[in-house]
Amino acid sequence: MATTPYAETAGTRPRVRRDVLFTETPDGVIFHNADGGFQLTAKSGYRFATLLVPHLDGARTVEEICQGFGDRQRAMVGELVKALYARGFARPVPAPDETAGSLVTAPPAAARFAEQIAYVDHYADDADARFARFRDTRVAVLGHGPVARWCVLSLIRNGCATVAVDPALPAGTGGVTAEEFATVHQEAADLAEQGCPVELAVLPAPGGASGPEGWAAYTGYDVVVAAGGPDVPSTVLPLLREGVPEGRMLLPAWTFGQRAVVGPVMTADSTGCWSCAALRLGASGGAADAAAADLWSGLALGTGSSGAQPAGPLAAMLGNLLGYEVFRLVTGALPAETRGQVLIQDMASFDVASERLLPHPRCPFCAAPARSPEPVDLSAAPARPAFLPTVATAPDDDAAQGPLAELERRSALVRPHTGVFTRYADEPVTQTPLKVGSVVLGAGPRGPRTVTAFDVHHTAGARLRALNAAATVYAEHVVPAARAAGTLDALPAVAPDTLTLASGTGGTGTNSGWTLATSLVTKEEVRVPAGAVRPFGTDNADRRFEPTRAGAGAGADLPEASAAGLLSALAHDALRRAVRGEGEVAVIAPESFGEDPETVFLLRSAAHLGVRVELLDLGEHAYSGASVVLARTTGTADGSGTGGSSLAPGSWAVGAALDRTAAAVDAVRDLLGAAQLASEAPESTGGGLDTGDPLMRDLDAALIPVTRSGPAAPAAPAASGASGEAVDWTGILERLAAAGRDALVVPTHAADLPTAGIHTVRVLLTRAVTDAG
């Protein structure tokens, strides 16, 4: 039997939001607020609302309100209350907590701070108890400048009963005069006369010979606010290093160059701390480099930040914001703006930005410890990146919705101040014939890098490719190598020279460390040289392993990232064989692709760009079943070595996929993307264009010999194994195992990238038994 609206709501206590209005209309009454509204159609609807709404204050249930009503009136009440609930115009509140020991605001304070209690009541239940908790909260405000003074005023004006201050603040020996601080004493005295006493305590002088240090100096205080000044970093960092005690909060307001920063709030179990914020801000490039140098040098030398400090209206804004933030943190009436976030204000323009703060992988307080890598089921990986449309769906208007949704998800990492990536840099670029995506990231001491990728279909796909490429750069150059918590001696070791990345030099003969890896073939755990996992890092300083991006992969999950890494490693292995003149390298005739739309489009675009492209099959299908195709320029379309293209002869790109057509598309796309940008800005070639770390540095592709006299065999629908059957990921692993080889995967991402759906790995290939020596 269907339940009536009255029966559904009879036991609830409806509480109408304070921003809801109702207005008479010719047909009844309309309920509305700033976000929308709805109409109740009834001849007496307005009078009905006038009589009923004052009783929807959460004090009584619908059943109690409807005592003595007839069935028709009860039905109207039920329909109205249900409509108010559905649209968020009202909420059901719980019955009052009358148990002993529950927090209750004293009557004088409840009368004096009725507006604050009403504000809490607008957003949350138990408003009186929430405000009583704020009133009982003991807050220590550190700092002696105008921001600290305004923070103290904000706290006591909104009902906080206990505030402790830096001794220099009331004494007038800091950035505030004694006369200016006298207004704080006057506010406290006025509240005391109204029955709302305020305790203004003075903290011990910092650096006292006999006084307690660290958190012990603030014993008894629930919230510590570092309210501005050049010494905030040197105040916050020791407290952070000691660890925020359980049940207490640390909230800083500080400056970074010409910006004022509020947050993040730190608790015993929070992630993303002041150190993370400073590291993120310092990696954004530009003026942030000088600001970071000033911050860390002032911290190391004990001189504090040398930049300008907030004053005047800006100090008042920041101080009031700090007080309001403590109010929100304690009452929970609204989500705190500094929980997992920072507020950044330009001190010249007063522009404010709120940005999410993720734990920085180099932060010693928030970096997650290394965990054992989980076995990866490579068969779960898609044959091509999941966000890409197929040729069959590309004409469909809805085909781009998947990539757009995925791009929106991953763009959470792109923020100008505290993002993993700083911004997209592809707006000025001409998006034809190929779509171009570029993303800027801070890549450690070498400064920002702009990583670019290309796509045949749409800019969303190009940006997704660029984010994946930038993620592998970030994992290599920013994320520190994970060290296992325990010893790895019990695990079998992979000899350095058995890896395809081994340079053959032998290095210094010593191993700098080991990293835990998992076999894609056997799922067993082994230990591999750390220098092979981070070939651009200090673990490979002796260049025992070739510095290359080979094996680096990124994807929406570990299987997809591992598949990308495996193809990258196979491409590098095939390229090395081709350079040595081993294996079979054959020219691919363009007509072998038939009428495949993507290859037809790309080869025609090459002619329009004035580039003559030669495609080489590097023969990888004979080894693993995958296909690796090299695209290289042999001159311009008119046959000359110079002309319309800014790319030099011998420019190259490589593609790897499960089938040869897809590999050729990847190779030609990346080669033509470079030609397209070079035709716009010639300086983008020759080192200006950054598509990620190099696969093989200083390669002159023109010197790769063609070892097969005839053209390569026509492309099959998918790469084939020895039996001629289509190859999938499982088939590739079986071929590797049959040759006595292995593929070892090491996750390289920190905790930040997976929050937006990006995982990164390094896949290491071992040599075949026949050439392991």
Tell me what each language-model feature is:
Residues 112-114, 230, 334-773:
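Helix-biased "structured C-terminal domain" signature
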Residues 1-431, 459, 499:
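Adenine nucleotide-associated cytosolic modules
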